[in-house]
């Protein structure tokens, strides 16, 4: 592009915010013009995040001072409840918005209000938002003014299911179980006793068994692709003693005669960020660390009619900031891979 895309980031002091800054610094078509934080206004980005010394000369500003309306696109890397109040004004001024919070993901307003415990401030805008699972909604994302970036668990679980659901390969009335593990960074950067090293290190636990906010988001995607499946969906998240990474083990029943690996390979043939591994493989979280990748394998359980899907992502990249940049690329007609060609870190 001859003219660079002017980008603003609201709430840039969290883990998804710094991940956006890291990825966008390597993007050839982007100028990060504004970064906001009410609590750190006036602090240089490079002082707050030493990893970005020599990369950014910007300082954090309050949203009112940052001139966000002069940006081409604004990312909201904010807690739930912020974007729904501030995004409408920017959209009215012609600014495109990608919201990394959950404010616009769930289309049914009462369902959203039940799970997030607040009244939605912009219910009329929810129907205009495009759900930004890039590999599912490319065409709609390209035309969107507002993209609801998916959650990390929904991304990790939905990507292996989408091709099978689109071809109605799952058996209705049978259980569909997602057993998921996340690194501690998924809890965010705020103070939380459960995220302390002495609590999360050398420990492994399930949480949200009675209900997790990502459950209705995943069910919404499933229900939109194949009838009779979402009702049997069970989702149990776990906290693993690692910083970043996400692993989903999904147990499902397929219709007779299905060749799921071929279905997955055909669907993702032109998707640079989804890697279908050979039968018998077991993807590892370290194989996607720092990269905008989802690696998937599928095989039938021994002496059983149950199929086992394994899916891994970096929760901060493909599960958040990387997918947001991928959506931005689609919105501006760029190659999806621009700024996202980082090789995973190993070890």
From Swiss-Prot:
Pathway: Amino-acid biosynthesis; L-arginine biosynthesis; N(2)-acetyl-L-ornithine from L-glutamate: step 3/4. Coiled coil: none annotated. GO terms for cellular component: cytoplasm. It is found in: Cytoplasm. One of its GO terms (molecular function) is NADP+ binding. Its main location: cytoplasm. Catalyzes the NADPH-dependent reduction of N-acetyl-5-glutamyl phosphate to yield N-acetyl-L-glutamate 5-semialdehyde. This is N-acetyl-gamma-glutamyl-phosphate reductase. It comes from Neisseria meningitidis serogroup B (strain ATCC BAA-335 / MC58). The lineage of its organism: Bacteria, Pseudomonadati, Pseudomonadota, Betaproteobacteria, Neisseriales. The gene is argC.
């Amino acid at each position: 592009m001859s003219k660079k895309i002017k980008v603003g980031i609201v709430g840039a002091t969290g883990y998804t915010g710094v991940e956006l800054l890291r990825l966008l610094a390597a993007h050839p078509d982007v100028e990060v013009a504004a970064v906001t934080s009410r609590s750190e206004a006036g602090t240089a980005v490079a002082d707050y995040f030493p990893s970005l010394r020599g990369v950014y000369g910007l300082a954090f500003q309050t949203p009112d001072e940052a001139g966000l309306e002069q940006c081409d696109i604004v990312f909201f890397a904010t807690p739930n409840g912020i974007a729904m109040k501030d995004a409408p004004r920017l959209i009215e001024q012609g600014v495109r918005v990608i919201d990394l919070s959950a404010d616009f993901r769930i289309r049914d307003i009462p369902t959203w209000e039940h799970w997030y415990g607040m009244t939605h401030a912009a219910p009329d805008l929810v129907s205009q938002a495009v759900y930004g699972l890039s590999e599912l909604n490319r065409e709609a994302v390209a035309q969107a003014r507002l993209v609801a970036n998916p959650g990390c668990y929904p991304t990790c679980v939905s990507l292996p299911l989408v091709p099978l659901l689109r071809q109605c390969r799952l058996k209705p009335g049978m259980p569909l179980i997602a057993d998921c593990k996340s690194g501690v960074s998924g809890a965010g950067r705020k103070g939380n006793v459960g995220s302390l090293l002495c609590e999360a290190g050398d420990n492994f636990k399930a949480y949200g068994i009675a209900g997790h906010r990502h459950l209705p988001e995943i069910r919404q995607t499933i229900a939109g692709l194949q009838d009779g499946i979402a009702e049997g969906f069970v989702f149990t998240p776990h906290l693993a003693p690692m910083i970043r990474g996400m692993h989903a083990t999904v147990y499902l029943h397929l219709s007779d005669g299905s060749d799921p690996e071929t279905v997955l390979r055909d669907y993702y043939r032109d998707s640079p960020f989804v890697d279908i591994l050979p039968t018998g493989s077991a993807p590892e979280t370290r194989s996607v660390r720092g990269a905008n990748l989802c690696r998937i394998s599928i095989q039938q359980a021994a002496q059983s009619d149950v199929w086992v899907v394994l899916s891994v992502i970096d929760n901060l990249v493909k599960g958040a900031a990387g997918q947001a940049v991928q959506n931005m690329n689609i919105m501006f007609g760029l190659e999806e891979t621009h700024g996202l060609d980082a090789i995973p870190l190993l070890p």
